[in-house]
A protein has these predicted regions:
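Extreme N-terminal starter segment of soluble prokaryotic enzymes
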Residues: 1-5
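Active-site and donor-binding regions of nucleotide-sugar-utilizing enzymes
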Residues: 7-16, 21-28, 39-131, 135
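Short internal beta-strands
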Residues: 35-41, 195-199
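Acidic donor-binding loop of glycosyltransferase active sites
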Residues: 230-241
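Conserved small/polar residues in nucleotide/adenosyl-binding loops
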Residues: 295-302
Length: 302
């Protein structure tokens, strides 16, 4: 079988999005290819997720560039997913004889890859690529985990009344955006259930809210996340892979951005009317209650 080497990391600094979507791609391809995942310092959660999909190799962080290159024989397909893989690093992989796929949210470098996947952009003119590079752009190329692909096939009925809310701002959420929006949601008089999905590294900036309607959950499987989103009347999240997963489940989504690489995707979501816009959630200026109420009124006018 043809070999595919997947290269992606996760951490409190870069989040888990790169790792999750690349592993989702490995899961899609594992029956037809010999897949191996390469990553630095995996957490117990990452290990448990990789073990469900394919073999994995742990790289040493201080030498991961050279260590991964030395593992290549030249007959592999390589999938890279992170912002720090430069054009020169892409070229080094290509010079080995490998076929190269880059998964990226940005378009800030020249690509020598054979394929570039970017679900957050639809304009090919934004990309600096080789003549042979194939661009796979837009939602049709979103790398969703299996439970979300299955949820997308089912017809969902969106409720006008917001009673169940899920809040998810990544595994680390160092800015405690979760805490801010939990407090916002508690002001919605119709809400009777709030689930805040957090990671092991999450540390609230103030004492956690004590409210019978609120529960914190962590280490959710893909199936548990899909079930939660399908059961929620509103999902509040960042303009990231989580947002795509929530939309795939048919949920009403309120989303914002807090790092630069999310801004263009956020603008795409807004321009298509797919989300309730929350703007820059590190400097929140949108009142959630007003935004939800306004969207509800607009929906009934059209």
């Amino acid at each position: 079988m043809k070999k595919i080497y997947f290269r992606a990391d996760a951490s409190a600094t870069i989040g888990y999005g790169h790792f999750i979507r690349t592993l989702a791609l490995a899961d899609m391809l594992k029956d037809d290819f010999d897949c191996t995942f390469f990553t630095c310092h995996p957490t117990s959660y990452q290990v448990s997720e990789m073990e469900k999909v394919c073999p994995f190799v742990t790289l040493q962080e201080e030498a991961h560039y050279d260590e991964f290159l030395s593992s290549l024989q030249g007959d592999e397909i390589v999938v890279l997913d992170n912002y720090f893989f430069t054009t020169d690093y892409q070229r080094a992989i290509k010079q080995k004889g490998c076929r190269l796929v880059c998964v990226d949210d940005m378009h800030d470098k020249h690509y020598v890859a054979d394929v570039v996947i970017n679900h957050g952009q639809t304009n090919p003119a934004l990309f600096d690529v080789e003549f042979y590079t194939r661009l796979c752009l837009g939602f049709d190329w979103a790398l969703l985990r299996k439970p979300f692909l299955e949820a997308a096939k089912r017809k969902s009925i969106s409720s006008d009344r917001i009673e169940k809310v899920a809040v998810c701002f990544g595994g680390s959420d160092i800015h405690d955006i979760t805490g801010y929006f939990v407090n916002q949601v508690l002001r919605l008089c119709t809400v009777n259930s709030i689930t805040a999905v957090v990671g092991d590294a999450y540390t609230p900036h103030s004492s956690c809210v004590q409210d019978s309607r609120l529960v914190y959950r962590s280490r959710l499987t893909a199936q548990e996340m899909a079930d939660l989103f399908c059961d929620s009347d509103l999902v509040i999240c960042s303009a990231s892979s989580v947002c795509i997963e929530a939309l795939a489940c048919g949920a009403k989504v309120a989303a914002g951005w807090y790092v630069d690489n999310q801004k263009e995707f956020y603008d795409l979501l807004i321009s298509n009317g797919w989300i309730i816009g929350l703007g820059n959630v590190r400097q929140p200026s949108v009142d959630l209650c007003n935004a939800v109420s306004y969207t509800h009124l607009r929906a009934h006018e059209t």
